[in-house]
């Protein structure tokens, strides 16, 4: 089982995707401050995980709708900006265009030490609509992530902090044994506790911690 951001991907893919999208649709920059505010409030104990989920979920939905409405982002995938797309179709087209172009330019950020194997599981707080494409390109089909309703782009699950072990068991199975777990953060201690062996990743240096 591998954490994604900072572990096998060099950086934070959601932040990189956000800044990448701002190059084509500057309007999305308005969503940065609210997300940071929710994160700081949660970190300082002024908001519960449930409150952060609702707040971040609402901002994410607004952001994805801005992406879907962007004529410049639609052009990334070769779609005509006046193609008459509407509603759910427009959302899917816009997000797909952005995600595909992002990974066209960022797959080289996958760290060289990582060699995908068919039974690998990727565990991440990133969303399935973004991380799923990276997994597809790596030849992987098991992703435990935050999820978005593809019809409405509303967040249905935030795979974060204490939610991770619960979400892992829901997706992979309650009796699944983790032989090896790789992460870049001690915040993943609950997952480290579940694994037979665990490794801390810093850049391309890997240290066994369990």
Language-model regions, residue ranges each:
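Charged/polar, solvent-exposed surface patches and flexible loops
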Residues: 16-20, 31-38, 54, 58, ...
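Active-site neighborhood of HAD-like aspartate-dependent phosphohydrolases
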Residues: 1-48
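C-terminal cap/substrate-recognition subdomain and adjoining C-terminal extension
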Residues: 79-80, 91-94, 98-210
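Metal-dependent phosphoesterase signature
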Residues: 50-109
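Short, flexible segments with low predicted structural confidence
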Residues: 27-28, 85-86, 164
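Short amphipathic alpha-helical patches
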Residues: 28, 32, 38-45, 56-66, ...
